[in-house]
Swiss-Prot record:
It catalyses: D-ribose(out) + ATP + H2O = D-ribose(in) + ADP + phosphate + H(+). This is Ribose import ATP-binding protein RbsA 2. Keywords: ATP-binding, Cell inner membrane, Cell membrane, Membrane, Nucleotide-binding, Repeat, Sugar transport, Translocase, Transport. The keyword Acetylation does not apply. It is an enzyme of class 7 (translocase). The complex is composed of an ATP-binding protein (RbsA), two transmembrane proteins (RbsC) and a solute-binding protein (RbsB). The lineage of its organism: Bacteria, Pseudomonadati, Pseudomonadota, Alphaproteobacteria, Hyphomicrobiales. ATP binds at residues 38-45.
Length: 506
C-alpha cells in the first residue's frame, strides 16, 4: 500500500432538503492516478468542490498527510498544493494564453510592469509538454480543444501535490489525449496524486491505478483497477445490471432505401469542400474524424448556421432554398450543438422555456402570447419520453446534471418534430446511464423514420450506434464504412490513407 496523502471519511453535505453527500469517502495515495466514477448527480462534483475549498462539508473528517485540515477556499487549496482543472472552460478570452496561465502573478504583481517576455517563455515551456500553442495568442481565439489544453497547462504551473482532472479529454483529439496521459504518468512518477474524473471506461482502465465508485452521494467501493471489470464498475455506478449500452441495430430487411436527405456540392469558405452524401429514412449516419476535421462544419453548413455555404440540399426529393437556420428548422432539419451551454441552452431559464424555444408557434395563442399551460405540458411530455430527472419542468436548467441538461437540449430539438437531426457530440460529459438512454432515444427516433446524423469523437460510440459511418478529414468526406467493415481499425486506416495521399500529392 502506498503512502496516503489525502483521506476523506464520512463526508456529509446538504443543500436545503437535498442531501448531496451521505457518508462519502475517498483515500488518495501519493503518486497514483485515482479514478472517481459515478453517474451525474452521484456527488463527485460536490466532493471535489470540498477538496478544492469551493464548498465546506457539513460533517466528516479530512486528513492531509495524516493531519486534520480545513480547506476554506480555492486559494487555500492552492496553497496546500491542490490544483483543479474544471470540466467547463474558465479562461479569460480577452487576454493572452500566458496571462491566463499565470493570472495570479499578473494580478498580484506590485511593480508597474510585468516581464511578459519571461511570462511567455515560461508558458511556452509548459505548453510544449502538452500541445503546440503560441502563448502570445488571445485565449478567445483558440478552439475548444486548445482552450482545454491551456486549462490543463494552467494547473500544471501550480506546485501541485494533488491534481484534480474533471473530464480532461472530453474536447481533446486522440493525439492530444495520449500526450496528456504521458504527462499524467510523469507527474505521478514525481509523487503527484491525480484524481481522474471521466465517463470513459477505456481511459480509466488503461491509465488509472485505482478507482472509487460513488452513487447517490455515498461511497460504494474502492478497488485496484486490476481487481475489477468495467461491467462491475458500471453496475456499481447505477445500482443495477445495466442493459446494453447500444440498442440493437436494424436488420437488413428493416432498412429503408428511401433517401430523405441528399447533399451535393456543399462548400463553405475554407472549411467545407465538395461534400456529397445521402441520408436514408430511419438511418443513423455517423461522422468520424479528428477534432477540427470539419465534421461539425459540414452539419452547420447544411443547416445554414454560419457562413454562406454553396451547394444543393434536397429533402424528400425537393430542393430547398435555405437562407438561414430558421428556414432549416421550418423544413424540419435541426442541429444539436456540441456546446450545449454556449449555444444550446438558456441555463438560467426553465426547462419548459428551453424546450419550447424553437417552436413558439405551437404554444402561442392567436394573438402571439405564450400559453404557459401548453408550454409546461409539452415540456413534461418530452421530459417523460427522455426520462428527464427533474423536480419540475419549471426548474432552471442550471440546476440539472450534465446528462439531464443534454436531455433538455435533445427535447428542444424534438419539439419541432424534425425529419432530419444532426447530433454533435450528443453524449459528451454524460454518465453511462444517461448515455445508454440517449443511445436508446437516438435509435427510437430512427425507428420513427427520422434521419439522424451523429458526430462523435468516441469511435466505439459511433460504431455502436451508427448504421453507416462517413470519415471526414480537412472538410472533405474521404471514406465510408458499414457492416463488418465498421471497425476502429478500418476507420483509422481510412484517415491514415488520406494523410499519406495528401503527403504524396504535396
Amino acid at each position: 500500500m502506498g503512502e496516503v496523502i489525502l483521506s476523506m471519511t464520512n463526508i456529509h453535505k446538504a443543500f436545503g432538503p437535498v442531501r448531496a453527500l451521505r457518508s462519502a469517502a475517498l483515500e488518495l495515495q501519493r503518486g497514483e492516478i485515482h479514478a472517481l466514477a459515478g453517474e451525474n448527480g452521484a456527488g463527485k462534483s460536490t466532493l471535489m468542490h470540498i477538496i478544492d475549498g469551493i464548498l465546506q462539508p457539513d460533517g466528516g473528517e479530512i486528513l492531509l498527510d495524516g493531519k486534520p485540515v480545513r480547506i476554506s477556499s480555492p486559494n487555500a487549496a492552492n496553497r496546500l498544493g491542490i490544483g483543479f482543472v474544471h470540466q467547463e472552460i474558465a479562461l479569460c478570452p480577452e487576454i493572452s494564453v500566458a496571462e491566463n496561465m499565470y493570472m495570479s502573478e499578473t494580478g498580484q504583481s506590485r511593480s508597474w510592469f510585468m516581464n511578459y517576455r519571461d511570462l511567455e517563455k515560461r508558458a511556452a515551456t509548459v505548453l510544449r509538454e502538452i500541445g503546440d500553442i503560441d502563448p502570445t495568442h488571445r485565449a478567445g481565439d483558440l478552439s475548444i480543444s486548445q482552450q482545454q489544453i491551456v486549462e490543463i497547462a494552467k494547473a500544471l504551473t501550480l506546485d501541485c501535490r494533488i491534481l484534480i482532472l474533471d473530464e480532461p479529454t472530453a474536447a481533446l483529439t486522440e493525439t492530444e489525449a495520449q500526450t496528456l496521459f504521458k504527462i499524467m504518468r510523469r507527474l505521478a512518477a514525481r509523487g503527484i496524486a491525480i484524481i481522474y474524473i471521466s465517463h470513459r471506461m477505456a481511459e480509466i482502465f488503461e491509465h488509472c491505478d485505482r478507482i472509487t465508485v460513488m452513487r447517490d452521494g455515498c461511497h460504494i467501493r474502492t478497488e485496484n483497477i486490476a481487481d475489477i471489470s468495467p461491467e462491475e464498475v458500471v453496475n456499481s455506478m447505477v445500482g443495477r445490471v445495466l442493459d446494453k449500452l447500444y440498442p440493437p441495430k436494424l436488420a437488413d430487411d428493416e432498412k429503408s432505401n428511401e433517401v430523405i436527405l441528399s447533399v451535393r456540392g456543399l462548400n463553405e469558405g475554407k472549411r467545407v469542400f465538395d461534400v456529397d452524401f445521402d441520408l436514408r429514412r430511419g438511418e443513423i449516419l455517423g461522422f468520424a474524424g479528428l477534432i477540427g476535421a470539419g465534421r461539425s462544419e459540414i452539419a452547420r453548413a447544411v443547416c445554414r448556421l454560419e457562413g454562406k455555404p454553396k451547394g444543393e440540399v434536397v429533402l424528400r426529393g425537393r430542393s430547398l432554398k435555405l437562407r438561414d437556420y430558421r428556414d432549416s428548422i421550418r423544413e424540419g432539419i435541426v442541429y444539436l450543438s456540441e456546446d450545449r451551454k454556449g449555444d444550446g441552452l438558456f441555463l438560467n431559464m426553465s426547462i419548459a422555456t428551453n424546450v419550447s424555444a424553437l417552436d413558439i408557434g405551437r404554444i402561442s395563442n392567436g394573438m402571439g402570447f405564450i400559453q404557459r399551460r401548453k408550454e409546461m405540458k409539452r415540456a413534461d411530455e418530452l421530459g417523460r419520453r427522455l426520462k428527464l430527472r427533474a423536480n419540475s419542468v419549471g426548474d432552471a436548467v442550471s440546476t440539472l446534471s450534465g446528462g439531464n441538461q443534454q436531455k433538455v437540449a435533445l427535447a428542444k430539438m424534438l419539439s419541432v418534430e424534425p425529419e432530419v437531426i444532426f447530433l454533435d457530440e450528443p453524449t459528451r460529459g454524460v454518465d453511462v446511464g444517461a448515455k445508454a438512454e440517449i443511445h436508446r432515444q437516438i435509435r427510437e427516433l430512427a425507428r420513427q423514420g427520422v434521419g439522424v446524423v451523429v458526430i462523435s469523437s468516441e469511435l466505439p460510440e459511433l460504431i455502436g450506434v451508427s448504421d453507416r459511418v462517413l470519415v471526414v478529414r480537412e472538410g472533405r468526406i474521404t471514406g465510408e464504412v458499414e457492416g463488418d467493415d465498421m471497425t476502429e481499425e478500418k476507420i483509422m486506416q481510412l484517415a491514415s490513407i488520406t494523410i499519406m495521399q495528401n503527403a504524396a500529392e504535396a
